[in-house]
Amino acid sequence: MKLSTVLCCYLLLLGLFAPEIISDSPPLQDVCPMAPQGERKLFMNGFFCKSPSTIMASDFKTLLLNHAGDLDNMVRSSANIITATEFPGLNTLGISMARTDIAVSGAVLPHSHPRASEMMFVHSGSVVAGFFDTKGKLFQKTLAEGDVFIFPRGLVHFIMNYGFGLATTFSVLNSQNPGVVGITHAMFAPDSEVAEGLMARMLSFRDMGMDDSSSVDSPWFY
C-alpha cells in the first residue's frame, strides 16, 4: 500500500476518533455526584463518585446562582461560574454553568475558557457581546432579553452592559471544568491603568455601534 494511502487512512481515523479523545469522557453510569473531600484517596482527572446508596436529589440542586454578585468594583460586574467542585451533581456530565451580572456602564473584561465553548442567554437587560478569532477579527452583536450568543472554545471574549439598568446573563459551558484565563489577570493587576485602558477600549467598540464582524486593532489580541 502506498504511503499516501496509509496517511489518508490514518487521518480519516484520527478525524473520527479525535472528538472522543479531546472532549470530556462520557459517564459510565446514570449519575455520579462528586465524593466529599474526606472520602477521596487518589487524585485523578475528575472526581470520584459517591456511593450509589448515598446519592440524593439534593445533589442535583444548587442555589449558588440565585443572587447577583458583588458589583462594587472597577468594572462594575460579577461573574460566578459553577463547576463540579461547587455543584457535585455536575460530575461526569461534561457541563458547568455561570451567572453574570453587569451594572450600567459595566463590563466583563476579555477572557477565555481553554476547555469549553460557552452558550450565553440574556435573562434581563441589554448587552453587547463579542469575541475575537485567532486573526484578530471581532464578532460582536447587541443582545436583548431572550437572545442567545455563542463564545467558541478558547477564544477571547467579553460582555458589556448596553442598557440603562442591571443586565443579567446565564451561561452553559460544555466542560465540568472549563477554566478561565483572564487577560488582565494574566498580564497585569485588574485595577491598573492598563486595565482601565482596556475598559475604555471596550466601551469604544460599543459606542461605535460595531455589529456582525469587523477587523480591529485589539490590544489584547495575540
Swiss-Prot record:
Mn(2+) binds at H111, H113, E118, H157. GO terms for molecular function: manganese ion binding. SUPFAM superfamilies: RmlC-like cupins (SSF51182). The keyword Secreted applies. Residues 72-195 form the Cupin type-1 domain. Its main location: secreted. Oligomer (believed to be a pentamer but probably hexamer). GO terms for cellular component: apoplast. Residues 1-23 form the signal peptide. It is found in: Secreted, Extracellular space, Apoplast. Disulfide bonds join C32-C49. Belongs to the germin family. May play a role in plant defense. Probably has no oxalate oxidase activity even if the active site is conserved. The keyword Metal-binding applies. Keywords: Apoplast, Disulfide bond, Manganese, Metal-binding, Secreted, Signal. It comes from Oryza sativa subsp. japonica. This is Germin-like protein 11-1.
